[in-house]
């Protein structure tokens, strides 16, 4: 009888611990992050090159570490469904990053692309991967 009670109490405490652990590790989707695919840092792929891309929107940031065999930052992100866009006269116009849409026509928002803290001089699909570089996509407003 005592063993059954101890086992039941242990099972209940274990369940409570698991629920607390899961709920503490879950970020809440709010604002522009409501449609985000990832709310926490994530790793993708298993290629020879490593590219690290920070995604910043409002006050929140996630970092994606991608191992890829692709040659450009854009191709690595597209390979894992992390960006979407439309081809335009100047190359790929990124409209969605991590599930977050920036619609310039609607609210003058766009995705700015930075390399080592400087606004990129080339589009994301033309920027070759430099494993030592710091890349950032930032939800910006004109």
Where are the model-predicted features located?
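Ubiquitin-like/PB1-type beta-grasp interaction modules and other compact soluble beta-rich domains
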Residues: 2-13, 19-142
């Amino acid at each position: 009888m005592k063993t059954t009670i101890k086992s039941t109490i242990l099972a209940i405490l274990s369940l409570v611990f698991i629920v607390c652990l899961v709920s503490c590790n879950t970020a809440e989707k709010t604002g522009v992050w409501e449609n985000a695919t990832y709310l926490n840092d994530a790793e993708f792929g298993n290629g020879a090159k490593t590219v690290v891309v920070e995604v910043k929107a409002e006050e929140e940031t996630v970092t994606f570490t991608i191992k890829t065999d692709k040659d450009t930052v854009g191709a690595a992100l597209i390979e894992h469904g992390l960006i979407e866009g439309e081809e335009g006269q100047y190359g790929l116009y990124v409209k969605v990053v991590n599930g977050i849409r920036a619609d310039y026509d609607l609210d003058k928002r766009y995705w700015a692309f930075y390399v080592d803290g400087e606004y990129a001089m080339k589009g994301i699909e033309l920027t070759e991967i430099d494993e030592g570089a710091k890349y950032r996509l930032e939800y910006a407003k004109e």
